Amino acid sequence: MRTFFVSLVGIGFLLMSTQNDAAAGETMLLETSQGQVEITMLPDVAPNHVARITELVNEGFYDGIVFHRVIPGFMAQTGDPTGTGMGGSGSKLTAEFSDYEYRNGTVGMARSSSPDSGDSQFFICFDGCGHLTGQYTVWGQVENGMDTVQKLAVGEPPAEPDQIISAKLVD
């Protein structure tokens, strides 16, 4: 009986550590109409946002969604199925503000004037985003592909917006 109990506890710890390692090492791969973008998700900074983004990616939510707002020197925004900047998945998130500094390639959750209105829309910063630190939830950092983000069609919305062809999670 003791051996069974020890084995059961050991399996439990193994499962818990596997889940934590998978979440911490998760990379979101965006295949866009301009190329690939690799985003390292930051569950230690925004665990609830990373969990929600993971759900949306696994559901295929982001596949086919356009970059509806691209402002040179500031950011590129996506995640709205209507392409207007007004839509979302229908599930609001409580803000997880941090002191993680917004810089080139930082990925943040878009929201309205209400701090707890983040849903599915997110933005990728170019350079002029430092003032957003502590004001918008950071959940990722682009590791590869900022050259791709820089190629996205500009506008609010762009006349011919680029899109996310597919989004998936990779190790």
Regions found by a protein language model. Give the residues of each.
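Cyclophilin-like peptidyl-prolyl cis-trans isomerases
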Residues: 5-6, 12-171
